[in-house]
A protein has these predicted regions:
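A short acidic-to-branched-hydrophobic micro-motif
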Residues: 61-82
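A generic structural signal for beta-strand entry/edge sites
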Residues: 49-51, 68-72, 114-118
Length: 173
């Protein structure tokens, strides 16, 4: 840490202090995620109790900074399993994702009606000690690209689930 550094002259000391403060970890909060998304021109809205939602044509992304220990990016893919066969297809893709990819973690989740299922993918990072801006930027880029890549692959593997176009408009199958 800073204790071990050797100080040479006042200007070096001042510069070192400034560099350390720029690279310092700070707590992750919903406001900090808001600033991050705004800085990247991401159009988002408030979702329930401190979550921020971002909609893409094929998914809904949810940023959750309410847990002081973990920052989570969770996304629900727009494809829905409406039959037992489709449930099986989703479950196979989830198992393949979780056994062959470093991220995201995927799972099948029942929808409100209890008869249909959606697919959720999430990436988490431990934030107990806070994150530097570089770490936060890196988590944003890595988690978004891992989840978006997984969903793009799903749409190739399971074209029967895709009932929307590239603008997110519903299309009949």
């Amino acid at each position: 840490g800073a204790d071990a550094s050797v100080t040479v002259g006042v200007s070096d000391s001042v510069r070192l202090t400034r560099e350390l403060s720029v690279a310092a970890s700070s707590p992750v909060s919903t406001d900090r995620i808001r600033d991050l998304l705004r800085s990247r021109d991401v159009r988002f809205g408030d979702y329930n109790e401190g979550e921020l939602a971002y909609l893409t044509p094929n998914a809904a992304f949810f940023w959750n900074a309410t847990n002081p220990q973990i920052l989570q990016l969770r996304a629900q893919w727009r494809g829905i399993a409406r039959t037992p066969e489709q449930f099986g297809e989703l479950a196979r893709e989830v198992a393949a994702c979780n056994s062959t990819r470093t991220g995201p973690k995927a799972y099948v989740a029942p929808l409100e009606d209890g008869t249909q299922y959606g697919l959720i993918a999430e990436c988490n990072v431990v934030v107990m000690s806070g994150l530097t801006q570089a770490q936060l930027d890196n988590f944003f880029e890595t988690s978004m690209s891992m989840i978006m890549g997984f969903f793009a692959d799903l749409e190739v593997t399971l074209p029967g689930f895709v009932d929307w176009d590239s603008q997110g408009r519903e299309v009949s199958l």
